[in-house]
Amino acid sequence: MENGFSLVPKEEEEEEDYSNEKSEDQTSYYLSTEMMKKVSFMAAPMVAVAASQYLLQVISIVMAGHLDELSLSAVAIATSLTNVTGFSLIFGLAGALETLCGQAFGAGQFRNISAYTYGSMLCLLLVCFPISLLWVFMDKLLELFHQDPLISQLACRYSIWLIPALFGYSVLQSMTRFFQSQGLVLPLFLSSLGALFFHVPFSWLLVYKLRFGIVGAALSIGFSYWLNVGLLWAFMRDSALYRKNWNLRAQEIFLSMKQFITLAIPTAMMTCLEWWSFELLILMSGLLPNSKLETSVLSICLTMSSLHYVIVNAIGAAASTHVSNKLGAGNPKAARSAANSAIFLGMIDAAIVSISLYSYRRNWAYIFSNESEVADYVTQITPFLCLSIGVDSFLAVLSGVARGTGWQHIGAYANIGSYYLVGIPVGSILCFVVKLRGKGLWIGILVGSTLQTIVLALVTFFTNWEQEVAKARDRVIEMIPQEII
């Protein structure tokens, strides 16, 4: 396929592009129309990629929900717990590649990209084993929280059959970052849509026609993740970067694993601590007097917030890619311009989504529930939800900038302080002491998100971008064999 059409650019073209990157016009120090176009063009297909991967589990829940109420409850609980204990952790750990691969690509060190990706796959696959062991005993964990024994057994069964999906997801996230760090979103877009289109009929076939029930719902997710991996592997093999730089030595792989783990732990903390705080919100709502109403309303608000986060997180991914590429290329002004352009786009997203949601605050809740009591309660919380969505728009973009520069440790500390030392305690007081119920819990999360956004915004504003270029250079040099240096 050397002379044929390829979805993956050849290495020679990549080298030429990034050698020219260093000599580009650097007058657009704060905002650049051209940079906003680049971020937008990358973010748009990344929305489809993230949404496609997100919908796989949603579709399986819908399929299980049409079996019976018991199956729906078991799959919903299992999905929540497997996300908290497994998928969120894998997603967070893989985020370290956004720093490592992105800066290596900007510096033209393509061999490093292969080493980091391979090292990431090995690390994440190893992490899957203890997670799988936990899932095998999921019923015992649920019984500790006084869940119904029958629901616990079904949830455990679903979790066990979801283990192949966990391993597929770990490889998929590494490969996703491999392409994302190079700005190659078309392979991601096509493979994700292909997996989604396969998943719908295949899940229906396993669940209903072959009568596998919830086991079929779990297996279909695993098949779809591995299909996505296979499609991306086909695209990767067509890349000159793969053919020339995949024959790695053991020393390179172990060195890449060391660097990966150093960044992966704080990256996972950034992602997981925020993710877990929202799950804790739902658990705390179950302690309220009218727990069914409170949990339903907060679940609806959380679903809407999660759907929005899929969009704005794509802008954060684009910001991460462009910032890391520019730092690796030794271009501090372009890196700052990329960060500012992404933040500006996040501001536009915050305004559009918040205003739209507030304008239809009396109607949108009926998408999720026909109960007027639920819809009225959602209407009361919507102003706080709009504020939360506005803050999340900035937070997702700033988190992307943090991953692109390698500030994950700052984000992790900010998460602990913002959510667990301030946000959740404030929410608990407002909920149980001031008697604001679910509204108080959501205000607490909003306070935590706002504090974290302020911290990351201040760090970004006062950043010495020339110093960040030097750090990126040191990180890249650490992976270059000594005999070459």
Curated annotation (Swiss-Prot):
Where is region (Disordered) located?
1-26
Q: Which GO terms describe its molecular function?
A: antiporter activity; xenobiotic transmembrane transporter activity
The record's subcellular locations are: Membrane
Tell me the InterPro entries matching this sequence.
Answer: MATE_euk, MATE_fam
Cellular component (GO) terms are: membrane
Q: Looking at the keywords, is Calcium present?
A: no
Provide this UniProt record's keywords sorted from A to Z: Membrane, Transmembrane, Transmembrane helix, Transport
Q: Does the keyword Membrane apply?
A: yes
According to Swiss-Prot or TrEMBL, what is its membrane topology? Multi-pass membrane protein
A Pfam family of the record is MatE
Q: Which GO terms describe its biological process?
A: xenobiotic detoxification by transmembrane export across the plasma membrane
- Annotated membrane-spanning segments are 41-61, 74-94, 118-138, 159-179, 188-208, 212-232, 263-283, 297-317, 338-358, 381-401, 414-434, 442-462
Give the chief site where it resides. Answer: membrane
Q: What is the similarity comment for this entry? A: Belongs to the multi antimicrobial extrusion (MATE) (TC 2.A.66.1) family.
What NCBIfam families does its record include?
matE
Q: What is this protein called?
A: Protein DETOXIFICATION 8
